[in-house]
Amino acid sequence: MALSKEELIEAIENMTVLELSELVKALEERFGVSATAVAAAPAAAGAAGAEAAAAEEEKTEFDVILQDAGAKKIQVIKEVRAATGLGLKEAKALVDEAPNPVKEGLPKEEAEALKAKLEEAGATVELK
């Protein structure tokens, strides 16, 4: 059963950023093409294109930075271990030496979820 153009557009409108990214990758692989912009007018689009690409990257990938462990340091260490898979010694060192990145390059949803877990455990967390 084929989708009409309107149904396809509607389906794309309802996708998350992560789902759209996966769709683009799948289309690139299936058709052997690249979704990078064609440099038809490099002088006009050079700086603006680079700034737009940087802004888009900032919006899709976040670093979770532990600023302070707070009073419940043991709970924060447990959450760091659960999120990163680090051993007890490594997780304790990461928490003791704050500010430190807990995880980097996360999609917005995952970064916000991790931030919420760490803050619930008593930590002060920043997304960059």
Curated annotation (Swiss-Prot):
SUPFAM superfamilies: ClpS-like, Ribosomal protein L7/12, oligomerisation (N-terminal) domain. GO terms for biological process: translation. Homodimer. Part of the ribosomal stalk of the 50S ribosomal subunit. Forms a multimeric L10(L12)X complex, where L10 forms an elongated spine to which 2 to 4 L12 dimers bind in a sequential fashion. Binds GTP-bound translation factors. Forms part of the ribosomal stalk which helps the ribosome interact with GTP-bound translation factors. Is thus essential for accurate translation. The lineage of its organism: Bacteria, Bacillati, Actinomycetota, Rubrobacteria, Rubrobacterales. PANTHER family: 39S RIBOSOMAL PROTEIN L12, LARGE RIBOSOMAL SUBUNIT PROTEIN BL12M. This is Large ribosomal subunit protein bL12. One of its GO terms (molecular function) is structural constituent of ribosome. InterPro entries: Ribosomal_bL12, Ribosomal_bL12_C, Ribosomal_bL12_C/ClpS-like, Ribosomal_bL12_oligo, Ribosomal_bL12_oligo_N_sf.
